[in-house]
Amino acid sequence: MSSFKKILGLSSKSHKKSKKMGLPPPYDESCPMETQPSAPLSNDFFGMEDMDLYDKDSLRYEKFRFMLKMTVRSNKPFRSYDDVTAAVSQWDNSYIGMVGKRPFYKIIAVIGSSHLQATPAVLADLNQPEYYATLTGRCFLPHRLGLIPPMFNVQETFRKPFNIGLYKGTLDFTFTVSDDESNEKVPHVWDYMNPKYQSQIQQEGLKFGLILSKKATGTWVLDQLSPFK
């Protein structure tokens, strides 16, 4: 039997797949897309028979729960919020995770960065400052991204280095985003932004690849994701 397995190229060690829905792939296994779609989506394609296809003018509202734990370690103290977002925006470089949740993670990362607090200097490792933030909440997001796939209650963790100008260090983020099917009223997601930086939402969001516009009512809408971030 063992020789038969060798002929077929089968390993004697089996890798069991998780039967739980919504679990992300292991982040140390890269599965790059070697080709990109070159034709418009059609209801004739497999699995799209009854799908409500993307319409850039269609405004949708997504209601969800979220949790974020964020730790940023830097070689030197940040001088401004602009420095903070320049570093934090690097968190999803070479992104491997749930694609449908990525826009929501980006928004939560922007909001989380506005709440970062430095640890006491005496606790800083080798005099290198550490910043942290923890957020939980329920909210809604107006967007024009088309149909969003179901978001299961699954935790994803990302650890990335950054090297921006004078600053270099590491980013450790843990996200949980899931659909909120309750009938309770919830605030707009940007209401969680630190009031001190509310006026910078559009500008800072762009660093994370978020293209935002404001409705006549003053509500922020996520129009699209930048292809350059």
UniProtKB/Swiss-Prot annotation:
Region (Disordered): 1-35
Chain ranges for the short sequence motif dynamin binding as given in the UniProt record: 2-4
UniProt cross-references to Pfam families, sorted A to Z: Vesiculo_matrix (PF06326)
Motif (PPXY motif): 24-27
Compartments where located: Virion; Host endomembrane system; Host nucleus membrane; Host nucleus
Signal peptide residues on this chain, from the entry's feature table: none
Superkingdom to which the source organism belongs: Viruses
Cellular component, GO annotation: host cell cytoplasm; host cell nuclear membrane; membrane; viral envelope
Main localization category: virion
Function: Forms a double layer around the helical nucleocapsid, the inner matrix layer binding to the N helix and the outer matrix layer binding to the envelope glycoprotein. Plays a major role in assembly and budding of virion, by recruiting cellular partners of the ESCRT complexes that play a key role in releasing the budding particle from the host membrane. Condensates the ribonucleocapsid core during virus assembly.
Binding partners and assembly: Homomultimer. Interacts with viral nucleocapsid; this interaction contributes to the virion assembly. Interacts with the viral envelope glycoprotein; this interaction contributes to the virion assembly. Interacts with host RAE1-NUP98 complex. Interacts with host NEDD4 and TSG101. Interacts with host dynamin. Interacts with host NDUFAF4; the interaction inhibits viral propagation and is independent of interferon activation. Interacts with host GTF2H5; the interaction may inhibit host transcription.
Record protein name field: Matrix protein
Native source species: Vesicular stomatitis New Jersey virus (strain Ogden subtype Concan)
Lineage, highest ranks first: Viruses, Riboviria, Orthornavirae, Negarnaviricota, Haploviricotina
Gene responsible for this protein: M
